[in-house]
UniProtKB/Swiss-Prot annotation:
Protein name: uORF protein
Main location: host cell
Residue stretches of biased makeup (Basic and acidic residues): 1-19
Remaining remarks: Product of an upstream open reading frame of the genome polyprotein gene. The initiator methionine is coded by an unusual start codon CTG.
Subcellular location: Host cytoplasm; Host cytoplasm, Host cytoskeleton
Isomerase is among the record's keywords: no
One GO CC annotation: host cell cytoplasm
Keyword Magnesium among UniProt keywords: no
Cysteine-cysteine disulfides: none
Length: 106
C-alpha cells in the first residue's frame, strides 16, 4: 500500500468549524493547502510510524512522517510541538498541517 493510500485511509471526514471561519478546509488532495484545524500538539505514538493529533474539532486523526526527523522549525511553527519522530514524508506533514495555530494562515 502506498503512502497516499495509507494516509487518505485514515482521514476523518473534513468539515468547517463555524466558529473558526479563517481556517478553511480543502476538499481535494490536489489543493496546495489542507488545514485540518488548530494543531495544538502531536499526541502520543499509537503504532510504528503512526502518530495521532487532535484538530480544532477535537477529532483525532492519524498521519505518518518519515526519515526520523524531529518536528521542529517550520513544522513546529505550524503548530506541531516537541520532538516527535517516526517515518513518513515530511512534505506530507507540512501539506496536511498548514493551518497555523496562531494566525490560521496557510
Amino acid at each position: 500500500m502506498d503512502l497516499e493510500t495509507r494516509v487518505s485511509g485514515h482521514e476523518k471526514p473534513q468539515r468547517r468549524n463555524p466558529e473558526d471561519p479563517d481556517c478553511q478546509y480543502a476538499k481535494t488532495r490536489s489543493s496546495p493547502c489542507k488545514p485540518l484545524g488548530r494543531f495544538e500538539e502531536v499526541a502520543s505514538r499509537t503504532s510504528a510510524g503512526s502518530w495521532t493529533h487532535q484538530n480544532g474539532f477535537g477529532d483525532t486523526s492519524l498521519f505518518e512522517i518519515y526519515s526520523n526527523q524531529a518536528i521542529t522549525g517550520p513544522y513546529q511553527q505550524m503548530g506541531f510541538r516537541g520532538e516527535k519522530r517516526g517515518y513518513g514524508n515530511n512534505k506530507e506533514v507540512q501539506e496536511r498541517s498548514c493551518c497555523h495555530v496562531e494566525n490560521n494562515q496557510c
